Amino acid sequence: MFAIIIKDLRLHANQPKYRLLQFSIVLLISAMFFIATVEYFVSTRSNSQIDTGRNIFTILVSTLFIAITGVAAPILAIESIQDERRNANFDLLYLSRLSVVQILLGKLTGVLLASFALILMTAPIFILSTFTGGFRLRDLLTCGIVFLSTNTLFILISFSLALSLHENILSYGYGIILAVIFLPLVAPKPIWWISPLTILIETVKPESNPKVWLNVGGYFAVALLIFILIHQRLAFKVKGLKLRGRQ
């Protein structure tokens, strides 16, 4: 399993596409930090009640969430599966000593670590934003858990599409993922809670909301269901390959 993780990390690190993602995300977060800082500090002159630090942090976290979870993670997940298809490695993996669960966990962990590396690239900007105050360490930890649960779910959705389709995979992936993020925001208020972006914004509010943890548990539950469905499909394929090998 560790060999799969290392292989996937090398695949992403050696691609110009990954370095372009790194540069684009850092540039985007830097620009949003500068714009938000100027805007909110100007606003505080006329309204001292504005919580500048918390508002800046909310904008940065929301932007990073959309960039990583909504844009970068699907690309990395689909590329991970397509690379195995191009090189016809899947059949070799299926016939190896690794179980289907280990293969899936290896692919999932590789993409999660690559996504986490993209987040780490923006760490200096978030450290700089601490000088504006307004948020607590607990906010960072809660946001990290929301990132992990949602990222896991969206990566598994991308895996499922990449294993099922041969064309327009990224288009379908973006369609589903961006719909989950944004469509609930234009629906009546109770449906807002389906959107992980709503949950993320809720985590940085001064008062805690138990719905945050309920939704995080829901994302992990749906992710587990998709994982089981992918496992069942691949296990059936592995069984067929082994039967053909015996013949």
Regions found by a protein language model. Name each.
Residues 73-94, 107-108:
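Transmembrane helix boundary and interhelical loop/hinge segments in multi-pass membrane proteins
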Residues 39-51, 173-241:
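Terminal transmembrane helical anchor/hairpin motif
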Residues 1-23, 239-247:
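Aromatic- and glycine-rich beta-strand/loop motifs that create alpha-glucan
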Residues 17-41, 66-69, 175-184, 224:
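Hydrophobic alpha-helical transmembrane segments of multi-pass membrane transport/permease proteins
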Residues 57-83:
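Long, hydrophobic alpha-helical segments
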Residues 55-59, 109-170:
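Secretory targeting signals
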